[in-house]
Amino acid sequence: MGRTLAEKVWDAHVVRRADGEPDLLYIDLHLVHEVTSPQAFEALRLAGRPLRRPDLTLATEDHNVPTTNTLAPIADPISAAQVEALRKNCAEFGVRLYPMNDPGQGIVHVVGPQLGLSQPGMTIVCGDSHTSTHGAFGALAFGIGTSQVEHVLATQTLPQSRPKTMAVTVDGDLPAGVTAKDLILAIIARIGTGGGAGHVIEYRGAAVRGLSMEGRMTVCNMSIEAGARAGMIAPDDTTFEYLAGRAHAATGPDWDQAVAYWRTLASDDDAVFDREVVIDAASLTPYVTWGTNPGQAAPLGSLIPAPADYADPAARASVERALTYMGLTAGTPLSEVTVDTVFIGSCTNGRLSDLRAAADVLRGRRVADGVRALVVPGSMQVKAEAEAEGLDEVFRAAGAEWRSAGCSMCLGMNPDTLRPGERSASTSNRNFEGRQGPGGRTHLVSPAVAAATAVTGQLTAPAQL
């Protein structure tokens, strides 16, 4: 019987397999940041263990760093301590670090791909949920906890139970104005936040093939929001063109050999998935979340649902709680929901193509009175590339704030937060209660919808401008 893409990559990395035990996987790339690594490094130090493969370990500062006044000391003592610990640990154990203000610094899931470190057929881990981003390259990439971070630092291996496999096939072409972010929000709304639990999702079909690499990263990034262990897309010419010439990509005969192998990394025709879902791309429109989990999403042109629309008592209760927290009334058109803040950035949508999409909408327009718009590039390289194209001038002319690189308002662990009761349209990945600050209300959207929303002050698709 044939094998799926996930099974091929998994099998190629099994160091030890024994009945009744998890497989021991070799890890090709370990990405590290300041939040989940301090205890792991301290455990190595206390045990007197060296770092097994510093050459396969890369660190960057992203979660806690400010995106303004970056030359000043970090004001929050906990954030400052975590950043300082990362710098100390990387220096002691020989890990390459991209610190704040370094031209290579940025969000870990933006930095890895732009360096060409994320490659097809690899196993990639990080102490961060959205490590699934790298699955866009045909890598098996997933988040791990701090104790697992220690295990990888010490051994370059990780015990893991073999996951199930799931295929999400998106047939046809995405309509004009529908983006990768809309696609993944629609998928999560369809299968639910637990729909991928215990599975590696492989995204397939013409619509997925038509996405750029940055669009594919957006889709794979939010696999965890569907409950999946990881998300993957089989590599193809789009993948190879993106990687060619990057700092850590092979060259010459080594490149040719790598591409020849990468072309074998597709699910076999007779491979059997544990679950399959098919979606018609033509049916999709711009999506937005209305509730407090990414599965509570709907087309922007629809109405906010009512608890009575749900037969399951648990679902009804969840909707009631979400509407109360979000301060919304069932039956209200989503397009009438007003916002205070717009955030464009994150490891989901902080890449150059995302900023271009937002700038295309904002060019020649102004951010609405009373609305604050933050544009935060995913890395210092993205920032430099955007400035070379004049995108920063477009944002500033529109009245938006142009920031330095970092996770920023994706999560309330740095100065960029919502105040209680404030509502945002955000290109990030999670809309949980308090995710962007205590009492903050988050609507997940694409960069284009975020930019259009900034102009009108209410949830808006660009086509409505």
Swiss-Prot record:
Say if the entry is tagged with keyword 4Fe-4S.
yes
InterPro entries per UniProt? 3-IsopropMal_deHydase_lsu (IPR004430), Acnase/IPM_dHydase_lsu_aba_1/3 (IPR015931), Acoase/IPM_deHydtase_lsu_aba (IPR001030), Aconitase_4Fe-4S_BS (IPR018136), Aconitase_4Fe-4S_dom (IPR036008), IPM_dehydratase_rel_enz (IPR050067), IPMI_cat (IPR033941)
As to how many cofactors bind and how, the note says:
Binds 1 [4Fe-4S] cluster per subunit.
Q: What is its EC number?
A: 4.2.1.33
Positions binding [4Fe-4S] cluster in this chain are: 347, 407, 410
Pathway the protein contributes to: Amino-acid biosynthesis; L-leucine biosynthesis; L-leucine from 3-methyl-2-oxobutanoate: step 2/4
Q: What class of enzyme is it?
A: lyase
Q: Which cofactor does it need?
A: [4Fe-4S] cluster
Q: Which family does it belong to?
A: Belongs to the aconitase/IPM isomerase family. LeuC type 1 subfamily.
Name under which the protein is recorded: 3-isopropylmalate dehydratase large subunit
